[in-house]
Each structure stands twice: as C-alpha cells, then as structure tokens.
Amino acid sequence: MDLVLNREYYPGGTNGVLLQDASMLCKCIEPPAAYFKPLISCIAEGIYELELIPDNQTQRIRLFRCPNGIRSGIPIEVEISTITMERNIVPVSEITGEGRGTPSPKAWQNLLDLVGQALQQGEKATLEIRSYPENALNLTFHQIEWMD
C-alpha cells in the first residue's frame, strides 16, 4: 500500500494532503521546524516505510527506514505533541492556518485501520513525502536563509 503526502511549506508550518491512489484520505499539518530546534529541517522528503507500534491501550503509526538514515521513528499522531516535542504528522479535518488545523481523531483512526489492514495482509506500507514548490514557499533548500 502506497500513500503520498503532498506538502506545501510556509514559515508558520507545513500543510499537506494525504492521498492513496490519487484519492484524498485527509489533510495533514506539521509544526514548523523552528518549533523544535533551530536549523533542523522538518521531516525530509522521501519514501518511508510505515509500521504500527503498540502504545499503552492503542497503536500508533510511525515512519521508519528514513531515506537519510536519521530521524527514524517519526510518529503520525492524533494531535501535535507539545509535551514530548516530537516531530509528527497530524491528520486534520480542516486546515486553519500555516501548520495549524483541527485535529481529526476519525481521520487518524481511519489511517491507522488502513495501514494496519495492509500490514496484516502482508503488504508493505509506504509513505512518499513530496512537495510542489510552485504551490507555496518551499523551504527545503532555503531554510537556513529563512531562519536568519
């Protein structure tokens, strides 16, 4: 099962659309890189494998086998994790601003079910993260200048 996250970068955060077979599953947000550490990029574009991990009473989805070999274990969360300060991708019902939105537990659960079903059937689940620079300010290669 292949998922695609099409991103648009903004100074206040990243907005995106999560697709499967060109059909929209949900919208997603990511907090800006500066939210975590200066000069550290947000989750790098590339193709990631997805896995389910148990977490207390529920399961979580996380990205692993990251293209550059660092930052493995990035979670897809129900909401932005401000307590643990983790980088994460958050499914939302509505985008309300740059990297902001209304968290959607329903969208997150649907995604969890979809990934879980694929993995149980022995499929490999992947997430390709990409962007279209013409749609928004793309900070992938210019982030250091933006942060100065």
What positions do the PLM features span?
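Cell wall/extracellular polymer interaction/catalysis modules
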Residues: 1-126, 130-148
